[in-house]
């Protein structure tokens, strides 16, 4: 009887130890699976350096990685609500609606660097939607020139040797992110020369 009980006890210890080993093994596998959900190094490598920034969206201030626009032609514009060039919002929206299916995205960055965007993000978002029906992506109010400029605008300035001189300055980034051209505030987004350059960039193959 005692030998039978000892046998059962030994069997119980063996099964318990085996179960613990299995649990530990499975526990070690979970983090590895979780890591696979992160963006791979290969995907990151495709994103051009000029887009490797995370910025807050205007409407809800949630972070957004600009790498999601990899392979598109990107037009970056610093905007303001009380500027003589503010009606360019209409042209920018028309441009976006006309070319977004061909690979263009317009990114708007409100700024008070020239003292013509005093409102907070919510007021700016309401103005853009209610006045011009803006649908292209807009981001939180930011600094676009000088020592306090955002990293994105610092790089755009470095790549073109031109910082925004006024509101509605424009930077056109090629699909592969290797070419960046700047356009001053007086260049309307629907200007024929600008559209010619845009068509050229859109016709380039996606990297």
Language model regions located:
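Thiol-/selenol-based redox modules, centered on thioredoxin-like
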Residues: 151-154, 158-207
């Amino acid at each position: 009887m005692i030998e039978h009980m000892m046998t059962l006890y030994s069997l119980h210890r063996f099964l318990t130890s085996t179960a613990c080993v299995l649990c530990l093994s499975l526990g070690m596998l979970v983090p590895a699976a979780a890591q696979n959900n992160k963006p791979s190094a290969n995907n990151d490598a495709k994103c051009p350096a000029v887009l490797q920034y995370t910025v807050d969206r205007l409407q809800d201030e949630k972070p957004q990685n600009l790498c999601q626009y990899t392979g598109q032609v990107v037009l970056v514009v610093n905007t303001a609500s009380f500027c003589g060039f503010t009606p360019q919002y209409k042209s920018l929206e028309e441009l976006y609606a006309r070319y977004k299916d061909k690979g263009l995205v317009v990114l708007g960055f409100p700024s008070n660097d020239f003292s013509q965007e005093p409102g907070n993000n919510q007021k700016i978002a309401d103005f853009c939607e209610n006045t011009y029906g803006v649908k292209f992506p807009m981001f939180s109010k930011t600094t676009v020139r000088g020592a306090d400029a955002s990293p994105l605008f610092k790089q755009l300035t470095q790549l073109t040797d031109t910082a925004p001189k006024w509101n509605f300055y424009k930077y056109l980034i090629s699909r592969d992110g290797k070419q960046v051209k700047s356009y001053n505030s007086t260049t309307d987004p629907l200007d024929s020369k600008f559209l010619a350059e845009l068509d050229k960039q859109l016709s380039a193959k996606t990297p």
